[in-house]
A protein has these predicted regions:
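Low-complexity intrinsically disordered segments
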Residues: 35-76
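Residues in intrinsically disordered, low-complexity segments of regulatory proteins
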Residues: 8-10, 33, 51
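Short, surface-exposed terminal/edge motifs of secreted or surface/virion proteins that either
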Residues: 18-29, 33
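Amphipathic alpha-helical oligomerization segments
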Residues: 4-22
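Phosphate-interacting basic helix/loop segments used at nucleotide- and nucleic-acid interfaces
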Residues: 1
Length: 76
């Protein structure tokens, strides 16, 4: 029986304009967004986040909250 190759998303982040995404590889910040993170998946639209560079979350080591449209990393 054939199986789907479903990616395991490891990183979660928000860009300057509020878009929250997950990706498979550690992305780099470029301009106002995250790039080069392998496969991506859209999660949610939030609010514009001037601190977007602080939103890169490694889901294997940290937790997060998404409140009032802003993604925040929570250290475990």
């Amino acid at each position: 029986m054939a199986k789907f190759d479903i990616p395991k998303f490891r990183y979660l982040f928000q860009d300057l304009f509020g878009e929250v995404q997950a990706c498979t590889k550690k992305p780099s910040s470029m301009g106002y967004e995250w790039r080069n993170g392998g496969e991506y998946s859209f999660i949610e639209y939030g609010k514009k986040n001037p601190n977007w560079r602080d939103t890169l979350i490694d889901l294997e080591t940290d937790d997060y909250e998404f409140e009032d449209g802003i993604l925040r990393r929570i250290e475990r």
